[in-house]
């Protein structure tokens, strides 16, 4: 079984993952660290490999293109990133660009997990869409979950609503300004974007 998930995984064990932000340290150690190992055993005690979702994105891109130097970014609930170097290797680097600051404005949104301001997760994810909705003239029901709010904006965009489309254009502009920052750290030949 191949499992891709946000976070840091060592020997198929969850070492650090914002997915489990609200889980206490005690419960994390007891229930989360071996969550995927236990899931594999429940399915039938079959071989399993857990990898960072961003690395899987980049590897899929390398396989599809038959090339290397790929930075893969998936924008969804968060911002996942992975890299396949010019030698065709998944580097094992900590590619959590979700927590890379991209906005130095003192009033930038604070990421609740890292405590940093202006992190990519707040711009290249559902949080970014929700943040831009009021400026685009879209009111979202506060009782909705973040995923439900995103679906409202996505439906508007799919229906051709210019206000909703402007949100995605703005996120594209953010990304255009951020890619050169990423290129300072990664030798990018191809950029694979999902989300």
Describe the role of every protein-language-model region.
Residues 1-70, 102-105:
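Glycine-rich phosphate-binding loop and adjoining helix at the ATP-binding site
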Residues 7, 11-12, 81-87, 165, ...:
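Basic, gly/Ser/Thr/Pro-rich low-complexity segments located predominantly at protein N termini
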Residues 59, 64-127:
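Glycine-rich phosphate-binding loop of actin/hexokinase-like ATP-binding domains
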Residues 113-177, 184-190:
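A mobile "lid/hinge" subdomain adjacent to the ATP/sugar-phosphate binding pocket shared
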